[in-house]
Amino acid sequence: ERVILSTTCHVTTEPLALVGSRGVVAPLPPSNLLSMSYLKFDRTTLSNLDRSLQLEHIRSNRGGAFNCTTLVGCNTRKYHGLLVVPLPHLRRHNHILLSSLDATVIQHGAEFNLGVHLYGDGTVYPNGHKYIREYNIDKMPRTIYRVGGVVLQRESIFCHYKNQVIIKFTLLDSHSETTLRLRPVVAFRDVILLSHENDTADTTVHPVGTTGVRTCLYEGYPDLYMQVDASSHWVDEGYWIKNLHYPKEQIRGYESCEDLYSPGYFEMDLRNGESVYFTAQLEEVDVTTLPALFDSEVAHRKARVDLRSCLRNACSQFYYKPESNRHYILAGFPWYGVRARDEMVALPGCSIYSDHPERFHNVMSTFIRSSINFIKQIELPLDMEGVRDPDVGLWAIRAIQLFLSEYPDDSHRSFYLDFVGRIIDYYLSDRHPILRIEPNGLLYAEGSGTPPVTWMDSTIAGQAVVPRRGYLVEVNGLWYNALCFYREARGAENFPEELASVIERLGPAFEQTFVNPYGYLYDYVT
């Protein structure tokens, strides 16, 4: 069974990642479907909620915004939403503005709702998953529904450099007059919180042009603009959808039910072959440009035709550029921001090995600025966590080592090696707040487990579950590697004798400290 890592498909398929039931992996379709589309799911899989609700997709942009839900459009996490954006003036977490968009097909007065929602009492309503015939991802997510004689296609694009989602509906086939109704469900909340019906929410809806509306439930949030490009009318029929249930949160032990508000719906007639575009963003747009913008975004996507292309696309999802001179690798979607250690671990794969060396320079330059400020005890930007963690500088050296092994003559070589020397000197001078250098050359981590001092940072009542301290195996393995790499890069004749002496002591000390009688390595030694 083939699998694809859950790193957005940025997460970067442009990235779309398939997340498994444990948030790790998801099976790919049977081999007989790969010639048609590498990532394709049929009615059998999608109509079975036990299966389809385990399959999620994430799409992000360069600004840290994303959309994320299950393949059938049913939100199962409090983090799920169609337009999730950073609003740093409110809180450091992302915020969900548009939770979902429920489509309804109307023929001969009969309504067929294509949405799917779970409720706290176990109810599933509507049951739109029963109408899905196919879901595939080539350059973008595409869902095909069949309702009687109606065949409707839904495609979505999350814009690359804007906080904007565009959803295209195309009537592929119909034997009679067809009406399409689009009902948005809005949240206006932090991704880690849940909302409930209240009297504080401002449920006013304002018209935008002739085919759009804007709304903002709470003070401090930006207006959410929702527009369509077709001749349509907006129906002010707002109400709270109560007791929506997120089973993934229940499994995680968190509150799992909330109320969300739907302000009304758009309604329009569709003819065979006709398309309508729905867009949601933070400002008014010219709806006549939506078809061209949609096509342009699709043209810049790379098709997911095999595992490698999926992973390359996924890597791009994590590239985060909040400002022109600040470049990062996000630690993960949907809940993590920028974490220094994770960034340095992931940087080689997200740049060097995905054929984007320029990304390495951009991210490493930002990281080096932050690291030097940390060494100088200058206040650090709030958008990067964990710069003081004990092995962050060593992972950065490892990333530089891998980069220079691929690009040995790069113009940045001298700049990077100067930084490597500066980090090594920082550790040797005992200025790191957690680590100290021992006479045997090993690094020793101080700490009581409050807070945790390593990447194993789970806590109960403020205490580390695994209170690692002392000689840490990965820290000292990276430390030995850093020194040896620096000696090789500088050349033995230019290598300081002091560092050569540390290497001579460190090698034997590592073996004596960490290798146990059975040939395994101790995790840490106090």
Where are the regions that the model predicts?
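Active-site-adjacent bridging/hinge elements
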Residues: 146, 244-252, 313-327, 366-376, ...
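Solvent-exposed loop and edge beta-strand segments that line ligand/cofactor-binding
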Residues: 154, 261-267, 326-344, 380-393, ...
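Generic, well-ordered alpha-helical scaffold segments in large soluble proteins
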Residues: 314-318, 349-353, 363-370, 426, ...
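Short conserved catalytic/interaction loops centered on acidic-Pro-aromatic/His motifs
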Residues: 180, 413-414, 492-496
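Conserved oxyanion/phosphate-binding beta-strand-loop segments in alpha/beta enzyme cores
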Residues: 296-333, 362
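Aromatic-rich carbohydrate-recognition surfaces in CAZymes
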Residues: 173-174, 195-198, 270-272, 337, ...
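Catalytic cores of carbohydrate-active enzymes
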Residues: 309, 428, 435-439, 469-471, ...
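Terminal accessory carbohydrate-recognition/targeting modules of carbohydrate-active enzymes
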Residues: 2-303, 307, 334, 341, ...
